[in-house]
């Protein structure tokens, strides 16, 4: 029963994060924040699943490492875009 509650809650949050990602396409920073929210929910789902099945949590640490690298790469693209174009509008991103 508790697993059903965890999975349904995390799926609702995942769908909410996807909706925020699709609806906030004006600024790159808001898109990056919604992507980080989605990654956080995926980490929560992975952590619950690994603890339920009594597996080791090393894979979740690798997942966190890759998600931090993804966040740093996104922020570096954001800084580069602001330096070259002066704003973070996603419509001007297609010019590159």
UniProtKB/Swiss-Prot annotation:
It catalyses: a ubiquinone + NADH + 5 H(+)(in) = a ubiquinol + NAD(+) + 4 H(+)(out). GO terms for cellular component: mitochondrial membrane; NADH dehydrogenase complex. GO terms for molecular function: NADH dehydrogenase (ubiquinone) activity. Its EC number is 7.1.1.2. It is a multi-pass membrane protein. It holds the Pfam family Oxidored_q2. It is an enzyme of class 7 (translocase). The chain crosses the membrane at residues 2-22, 28-48, 62-82. The keyword Zinc does not apply. One of its GO terms (biological process) is ATP synthesis coupled electron transport. Keywords: Electron transport, Membrane, Mitochondrion, NAD, Respiratory chain, Translocase, Transmembrane, Transmembrane helix, Transport, Ubiquinone. It is found in: Mitochondrion membrane. InterPro entries: NADH_UbQ_OxRdtase_chain4L/K (IPR001133), NUOK/Mnh_C1-like (IPR039428). Belongs to the complex I subunit 4L family. PANTHER family: NADH-UBIQUINONE OXIDOREDUCTASE CHAIN 4L, NADH-UBIQUINONE OXIDOREDUCTASE SUBUNIT ND4L. Core subunit of the mitochondrial membrane respiratory chain NADH dehydrogenase (Complex I) that is believed to belong to the minimal assembly required for catalysis. Complex I functions in the transfer of electrons from NADH to the respiratory chain. The immediate electron acceptor for the enzyme is believed to be ubiquinone. This is NADH-ubiquinone oxidoreductase chain 4L.
């Amino acid at each position: 029963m508790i697993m059903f509650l965890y999975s349904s809650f995390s799926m609702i949050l995942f769908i909410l994060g996807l909706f925020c990602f699709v609806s906030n396409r004006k600024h790159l920073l808001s898109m990056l924040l919604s992507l980080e929210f989605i990654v956080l929910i995926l980490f929560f789902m992975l952590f619950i699943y690994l603890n339920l099945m009594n597996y080791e949590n090393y894979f979740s640490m690798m997942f966190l490492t890759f998600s931090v690298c993804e966040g740093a790469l996104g922020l570096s693209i954001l800084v580069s875009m602001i330096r070259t174009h002066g704003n973070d509008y996603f419509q001007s991103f297609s010019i590159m």
